[in-house]
Amino acid sequence: IPVRSPFGVTYGNKPVIDSTYSTLKEFPNRQLLGEDVIWNGNDEIGYHSSHRILSKGTHLGKGFYGEPTGKDIYYRVIADCACKNNQVYDEWIVRDQGAMVRQIGYSPEEFARKMIEKEGGVSNSSKLYDANSDKNSDYKAESYKDGSIAEKYTQVLSNIFNKSYEYEDYDRAANLFWPGNKLGHGREDIIEKWNSIKKIFTNIKFSIEHVGFLEEPEKNPRVSVRWFLEGEHANESDEYGKIGRAHV
């Protein structure tokens, strides 16, 4: 099983098991509160689930996040899993690390520096996920119909990054959950947050990698989209730091 995260790609179930034990050692009272699951598939072809989880716990043990602080934290995780024959065989996962370390007492920059130092410096540090990382998978996404909500929302995201967009597809009372446990209310906050990414990068390349969708009786249709963004870090911001000129 390949597991892809911002920290890179691991293979097999042992890294997953080790990571779970490590997390439980640091946060022994951790709870996983399911917020939503968007799934597709059947027993014959297998299933794909995109699940959004709110994790909460108390930092009580020494480990990846340093000495125990006794602080209560919460953060969100989104995982895309392909499953067949009661086994996960492909996974993508992203965790709100910025929210975690801020609540524990670090800034993201401070924590990143500690990680690099612990690994023996930049030249010895782990390779993070990038455009050249392994994306090969036996999983084949289910196609969506023309004119469907899945097509509509992928087009919204493409418009945000590829053209001048007026955000007319967002309701004026829409909410936005953003990394760092940040919450936006209304169209103005949504525009501000998306623009905060667009402003710091040049030579942006945006692509859609996977679309999950779910339409159920008497419920609003839901869509999960995994997308990939590349660009040059060319402008400074309070949220994303000083100009690095790095390809991100």
Language-model regions: role of each:
Residues 1-247:
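C-terminal and inter-domain tail/linker signature
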